């Protein structure tokens, strides 16, 4: 069982967000999600400049087991993508909360972050699954 970082917020669909110094939010999938998916073989990311809506599909993670849609945890504009995942999708497995991030969003409504789960709330989601 992995420890869930307390400095992040989480969506029940297993994405995490971290606020950055410039006001954007980095998005990735949780350790729990990557464990369920298994070894990543391909990641399809949104384009910089794309507008995304909270709860909408915006990326795909393909593993040896399955392909899984990745949902935007908050609405806003994609301001960066982790191009390292194109050549090294396994970074999602080795460092889900660090080098395995997917993209960054500049939020259009920062109050949406308040609706996300804290570490304890996300643990409850995992426990109920």
From Swiss-Prot:
Keywords: Lipoyl. InterPro entries: 2-oxoA_DH_lipoyl-BS, Biotin_lipoyl, GCV_H, GCV_H/Fam206, GCV_H_sub, Single_hybrid_motif. The modification N6-lipoyllysine is found at residue 65. PROSITE patterns: BIOTINYL_LIPOYL, LIPOYL. GO terms for cellular component: cytosol; glycine cleavage complex. Its cofactor is (R)-lipoate. It comes from the Bacteria. Binds 1 lipoyl cofactor covalently. GO terms for biological process: glycine decarboxylation via glycine cleavage system. Coiled coil: none annotated. The keyword DNA repair does not apply. Residues 24-106 form the Lipoyl-binding domain. Belongs to the GcvH family. PANTHER family: GLYCINE CLEAVAGE SYSTEM H PROTEIN, GLYCINE CLEAVAGE SYSTEM H PROTEIN-RELATED. The glycine cleavage system catalyzes the degradation of glycine. The H protein shuttles the methylamine group of glycine from the P protein to the T protein. The glycine cleavage system is composed of four proteins: P, T, L and H. This is Glycine cleavage system H protein. It comes from Shewanella denitrificans (strain OS217 / ATCC BAA-1090 / DSM 15013). The gene is gcvH.
């Amino acid at each position: 069982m992995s420890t869930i970082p307390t400095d992040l917020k989480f969506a029940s669909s297993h994405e995490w967000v971290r606020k950055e110094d410039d006001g954007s939010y980095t998005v990735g999938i949780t350790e729990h999600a990557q464990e369920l998916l298994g070894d990543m073989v391909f990641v399809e990311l949104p384009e910089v400049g794309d507008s995304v809506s909270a709860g909408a599909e915006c990326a795909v993670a393909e593993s040896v087991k399955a392909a899984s849609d990745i949902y935007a945890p908050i609405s806003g504009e994609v301001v960066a993508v982790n191009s390292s995942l194109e050549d090294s999708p396994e970074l999602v497995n080795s460092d889900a909360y660090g080098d395995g991030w997917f993209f960054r969003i500049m939020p259009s409504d920062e109050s949406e972050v308040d609706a996300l789960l804290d570490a304890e709330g996300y643990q409850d989601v995992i426990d109920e699954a």
